[in-house]
Amino acid sequence: MNRIDLSFNKVKEENRKALIPFVTCGADFTVEETADLIVSLEKEGATIVEIGVPFRDPLADGPVIQNAYTKALQNGTKVKDVFRCVELIRGKSEVPIVLMVYFNVVYFTGVENFLRIAAKSGVDGLIVPDVPLEERGDLDKICEDNCIYLIPLVARTSKDRIAAITKGAKGFVYCVSTNGTTGERKTLDSGTHEYLEEVRKNVDIPMCIGFGISSKEVVKEVKDYCDGVIVGSAIVKRMAEGKEAVIDFVKDLSDGLK
């Protein structure tokens, strides 16, 4: 069974919600430091960890993550370094790892080659924000062949479109809380709860909400409408402050989910 499924089964048994921090690799932390951080985050309540693969033109991301990617690339971070980070994590932990990666990175590595290395490294899921539904078929098949879940991103759209995007999804559905890029927001857009309820009608796997989840207060606001929360920019911003700042923030978020 995929580690993502095992983790959601566990949080369900414990009657709690999943906490999914997003981290970057090679910007403020070295590969080794990133791996150590992720192992520590699991101990502090992280259910799954999402790792962003640096890219020069991350259109779905806001300035905090864009700047982290730029710094990582300037530091010489490559795709192979992200895979090495996952391998280091696997030496110490079975926490599920999901890569957030733009398709150009996958394409230039070679789709089959990328997925093969990802599986060998210990990756459990893939989020590819710039691949539309109509072009997902081949990638979905190669992911399946490598026992990696292709996690769908679902934005606020028509009921028919939501149904099409989530059809056959595995692992969890990534619900985008707001139209636009990633980034911290003090409150969520109006209609978020209704949107999540519409997604819920179409899926029988966990739903997690991301984009704009920035504080314990926002976590408390949405936790009753989803199965987990994904926190990105607020984590990456604290990575620039050091490991303890990230750990303390994740502890606080975890408390908000109880």
UniProtKB/Swiss-Prot annotation:
Keywords noted in UniProt: Amino-acid biosynthesis, Aromatic amino acid biosynthesis, Lyase, Tryptophan biosynthesis
Enzyme class: lyase
Record SUPFAM superfamilies: Ribulose-phoshate binding barrel (SSF51366)
A molecular function GO annotation: tryptophan synthase activity
Origin superkingdom: Bacteria
Gene Ontology cellular-component terms listed: cytosol
Keyword hit for Nucleotidyltransferase: no
CDD domains: Tryptophan_synthase_alpha
Pathway in which this enzyme or protein is active: Amino-acid biosynthesis; L-tryptophan biosynthesis; L-tryptophan from chorismate: step 5/5
Active-site residues, as the UniProt record annotates them: E50, D61
Entry's EC annotation: 4.2.1.20
Reactions this protein catalyses: (1S,2R)-1-C-(indol-3-yl)glycerol 3-phosphate + L-serine = D-glyceraldehyde 3-phosphate + L-tryptophan + H2O
Record bears the keyword Ribosomal protein: no
Family label: Belongs to the TrpA family.
Record function comment: The alpha subunit is responsible for the aldol cleavage of indoleglycerol phosphate to indole and glyceraldehyde 3-phosphate.
Complex formation: Tetramer of two alpha and two beta chains.
Protein name: Tryptophan synthase alpha chain
